[in-house]
């Protein structure tokens, strides 16, 4: 008996301990974090997100290499077969998952926004909070991704979730008779939720992001918390088509879409599928995936009404289809938009939508699951907007008369939607990449000449140093060029030398007057040097600008007593003004750049927070950011040559003086009574003014974590480490956009 009883008691004890443990874990209060006690403390977390340690594939994994081993046609064949393999646990509308997967791909890519380049399909962020649990717009997309798991499981590390979701959207379109423009792979998956400012609201679908004039705050891309773009029922649920059109134009514009692309996307996308609002969500639908019980295994929005799916499905609360054949590419969306007069009605869930006034339309649309049931077509307020707005009306009527133009416009707009955050074409992978270069891809001419060798590089560097340009001028210019890069959507950077073109040449942070002088001298050096080269070898101005900064850093290090070589890899090319969309590049202009101690009135955050934002855009770590700020101050690289933070008596020399003097207790700091936002460092004994600084400078002595790093570089043995680390971080920024190396 004892032999049998002990395991039974052990099992019972285990079950009880698990049950009690679960209850105790729920009851235990969460520890109070530092952010509660010191809410104003500068948050460095953005510089630590998606660390390589979080990647289960490890540091040696190269996604591009893995992707290029795929048989892409075989992958697409598998995805296509999945389209019509309806699963009992989530049956396909009309027997085809195509429209469902289009919505998944669209809503994965559609959170992209131009002002900070965040959002988009790269990273596969739809898997993580908050996107995986956004109400209305992303309801049920957890099922779409779960349907794709067999495909992801089969191809594993060769196919990221980011690429799979977009590719599935493409295959869905093609399986329903639409010819897509192409597909480029290369979206590397993230392993945690990206830190994005989605808004300050504390309730879903709340709206506190408009000012008194009704203008949407930057960098927001959606009108309400938890939406992709606009409320389909109208602004804040008010069914006003013209007001809806205004919001559509703004939000789609913030995703880099013009009016024609916007119309093509809405009309093309709503050609397929249906909306789901069979019941009142408040009465039927359970918690979202993030809030659902552990037993739901990442699925949410459990529907307790009827079957819980099929004809009882609830997502947005709107109900119905836009065409009579929602799994085929047709012109019915536009045809019916103008054929019928549309009147307001409500879905079974009580949401405002529109149906034809003509009762003869009542049976045009088949039910998605019940063969003996038919319905009238529907439109959202955001659909009626395409007819009510004069500009959208001109485009929709033109598309209606010219189906081939509409089809091409949708194909190109869909391609742009799903690839906008992937960066330049050089990053695209796979056999389906279209040959055409598109202006929104920020094209750069292909390399068409032999590159200069090491001997040439040394000779060119000497020519630059002999040009009369100073170390600070060369460093400022190289930094201004390369630091325009942002890793959120892979735009900007030194390649292309767009710093000499509109609009970058006139950005205030770049000190246009000095920049023009420096570029003129560098262009002369380039011209003379290319004229001296034998054969067809050439060097671009983009390379000359970067090399100029690099040899300046070498010279500054040598004057500090350290001989070091700054790596340089030629191969950049020069873009033309024709290849540069001025309006598109305008959003890259920095409102602040703490590395240059530049801060404008257009900044949306404090100076220190804007520094973190800029460092995050450059994919820098905390130590990299710290060493770059200290080094650039020593090099006298501030915008417009301002002296704040230049804590050295030998500016232009790459010393660790910034850290030594910042940490010097003989200096007492006080707010300046002469200039707002500036601090004065006085000798603690005599009161004599020694230095001036901005909050960006002083944060490295005030913030406990940043001070800890600063102490490393300010120590007596810190000079060599400082120079070595500065050169590594400098080289990282200079090559941030070199996707070819």
UniProtKB/Swiss-Prot annotation:
Q: List the disulfide bonds.
A: none
The record ties this protein, via HAMAP family, to: Catal_peroxid (MF_01961)
Q: Does the keyword Iron apply?
A: yes
Identify the catalytic residues.
107 (proton acceptor)
| Cross-link for Tryptophyl-tyrosyl-methioninium (Tyr-Met) (with W-106), residue positions | 229-255
Cross-link Tryptophyl-tyrosyl-methioninium (Trp-Tyr) (with M-255): give the residues: 106-229
First and last residue of the signal peptide: 1-27
What does the UniProt record say this protein does?
Answer: Bifunctional enzyme with both catalase and broad-spectrum peroxidase activity.
List the catalytic activities from the record: H2O2 + AH2 = A + 2 H2O; 2 H2O2 = O2 + 2 H2O
Q: How is the cofactor bound?
A: Binds 1 heme b (iron(II)-protoporphyrin IX) group per dimer.
- Point out the annotated site residues (description: Transition state stabilizer): 103
Name the cofactor(s). heme b
Protein name per its UniProtKB record: Catalase-peroxidase 2
